[in-house]
């Protein structure tokens, strides 16, 4: 067996072409067939952003950069892989590859800063199931949350400062900063899930760092499952801000690290359309994507284990 430790970066996944949307949707739904209307609705969203998102490409770039940064500081100690929850390369296939490469110790790191049993816990379940199904004997150390890392909060704070400069200097103190993260079903509250508290805690910490005069927290991109989801929803919050007489909004989707559909469609198209209807100027921060400073943050998270 190799003495190296595998680092398994994990993300949600995204189809690469429109004709892959249906199978991707089936994967997201745990094997249940979506209706033709649901497939068309999701396909239309992908068409609106150019047919695909850069999530896979960016995750590959982060993987390669993290490998280089780790090799420079810790030669021959780590091998970095990436796997996706709902599209290729699928996490179980990557677990098999890690085993085939003779590596038994794995650090699992989902590319999402805040823990929830549904989100981060779901990634761990995929590794555990693959480990059991393929008898790979992987020893997994899962990093559940890294939102308290000072480097993460500093990166988001810097992105906010950069984005506030998009507004005229005489209105910057009138900008409402709207932190957002992916909504989850309300049933997580019954579990005592830490997700809402982690989100509010990191939003408050970043807002205090910057001494933001007006900031809110909201959820976005809730699913269509027929059950209640965590709120308030960002579109409702935009309407409330307009009713309060606000004019300028900066959205900070700090629950995400990479450009994908929830950013490129839900904010850049749907959110901006709603804001325009309400007479609001809506801007957003640049996501971390494959910024070398973000990769440096991940190196800190990984080597701290």
From Swiss-Prot:
InterPro entries registered for this protein in UniProt: Ferrochelatase, Ferrochelatase_AS, Ferrochelatase_C, Ferrochelatase_N
Binding site for Fe cation: 182, 262
Protein's UniProt keywords contain Cytoplasm: yes
UniProt xrefs under Pfam families: Ferrochelatase
This enzyme's EC code(s): 4.98.1.1
Keywords for this protein: Cytoplasm, Heme biosynthesis, Iron, Lyase, Metal-binding, Porphyrin biosynthesis
Coiled-coil stretches: none
GO cellular component: cytoplasm
Superkingdom of origin organism: Bacteria
Location of this chain's protein in the cell: Cytoplasm
Reactions that this protein is recorded to catalyse: heme b + 2 H(+) = protoporphyrin IX + Fe(2+)
Coarse class of the protein's main subcellular location: cytoplasm
GO MF terms held by the record: ferrochelatase activity; metal ion binding
Pathway membership: Porphyrin-containing compound metabolism; protoheme biosynthesis; protoheme from protoporphyrin-IX: step 1/1
CDD domains reported in the protein's UniProt record: Ferrochelatase_C, Ferrochelatase_N
One GO term of the biological process aspect: heme biosynthetic process
Gene3D superfamilies reported for this sequence: 3.40.50.1400
Function statement: Catalyzes the ferrous insertion into protoporphyrin IX.
Entry similarity comment: Belongs to the ferrochelatase family.
NCBIfam families, per database record: hemH
Name the UniProt record assigns to this protein: Ferrochelatase
Record organism: Herpetosiphon aurantiacus (strain ATCC 23779 / DSM 785 / 114-95)
